[in-house]
Amino acid sequence: MKKYVLALDQGTTSCRAILFDRESQIVGVAQKEFTQIYPQPGWVEHDPEEVWSTQYGVIAELLARYQVTSEEIAGIGITNQRETTVVWDKHTGKSVTNAIVWQCRRTAPLCDELKMKGLEPLFKEKTGLVLDAYFSGTKIRWILDRVPGAQEKAEKGELLFGTMDTWLVWNLTKGRIHVTDYSNASRTLLYNIKTLAWDPDLLQVLNIPLAMLPEVKPSSTIYGETAAEGLFGHPIPIAGIAGDQQAALFGQACFAPGMAKNTYGTGCFMLLNTGEELYESRHGLISTIAWGLDEKVIYALEGSVFMAGAVMQWLRDELKLIETAGDSEYFAGKVADNGGVYLVPAFTGLGAPYWDMDARGAIVGLTRGSNKNHIIRAALESMAYQTRDILEAMEADSQLPLQLLKVDGGAVVNNLLMQFQADILGVEVERPHCIETTALGAAYLAGLAIGFWSSKEELRDKAKMERSFKPQMAEERKEKYYQGWHKAVRQIME
């Protein structure tokens, strides 16, 4: 009897395996961290073999710990850290060098060079992305330049590229399948999100052979089966793939245009479903593919805030104002409001929609009456203001008024922050019962492809909300606070 869908969540710091039942409830979780490699400042790498062995290990641990047999698993869904780049030898299955992680800045000079040649508009128009070291394309170029003989081998079709989803599928199928999905392909700087094909012009600019790129398929389809001689002992369909942020959008059941989710982690990642319409941002956001499903491609606008939970870490580790991030709610709640104090966390510059990399952080509006609680409250509120900045840019780009914001990530347990977020946006904020929205999204995509669940409507009905926060603040007061934030931002940009 097929009772479960297995989600593999290959993240930036850990690999996880999570089992979901037909009610989309979590049956079991196994997780293990792997090594972060920092060869020099600004560089970040992972060892692909270690990532695979860690992922393999957590699957084995999950099955053993919860006494689940592979016969009970209907299918597998995969979600992954996006953009991280692996290049491996087709014949040996071994990577030619460490994976270059999405956070790695080593290809920034190459991006600058391409911008100087006036190529950024070409990339933006075809891929929806900005020319940045974040995305995979320049990482592939770096590997082909630095590994002896790599370019020649790639041209002969002897080397393969993949993001982490592709690498896991290759290993799960013992090298039989080289595939990715629309959402991951759309993060490479090489995939044309309008024609839905690897773009010959962009491949030519970066001199990347088409032969090394995976086949691109919808996010919910049977890609193939696990090797019978592998971990599971018999074939299991691999039926869902999506990049982590897109998977979270799907896991939050943001199926309709105008629905958005915000993940509050170290930074914030916001995605707005724009339906089958592709909007090109005029406000520094990126356009991306959310997923491919039911013969349709769904697009999204994405914006990120660099500093969210990281501000709480700063209050804890550097300023020593709190002992744990959770303390922030207690101290912030001891004052009625921010007392005119604003904290602009531009520690590494300001992201969307300002894009000022030279700006630096500041605490403004201090008076003799300001105390530690005001500063802690201002730090919390900065997450909500930055979220509104991005959502206003999304509304301006798409003309889609936000109906509801779904939230996930570590900071959403903070009720004061969630209520303030609802107040400052003027829309309802929903916190889900299942906070594992990324893994749930991968499970949903796989489950739909194999008939484990019948439709998106069924999934929407299963989505359980833990708590809803409705706006309570008067309009005039809300706008006064937000104007104060803008004034503080202007001060650090001058």
From Swiss-Prot:
Residues the entry annotates as binding glycerol: 82-83, 134, 244-245
Record-level GO BP terms: glycerol catabolic process; glycerol metabolic process; glycerol-3-phosphate metabolic process
PROSITE patterns: FGGY_KINASES_2
CDD domains to which the protein is assigned, alphabetical: FGGY_EcGK_like (cd07786)
InterPro entries: ATPase_NBD, Carb_kinase_FGGY, Carb_kinase_FGGY_CS, FGGY_C, FGGY_N, Glycerol_kin
Annotated EC: 2.7.1.30
Activity regulation description: Activated by phosphorylation and inhibited by fructose 1,6-bisphosphate (FBP).
Similarity annotation: Belongs to the FGGY kinase family.
Protein name: Glycerol kinase
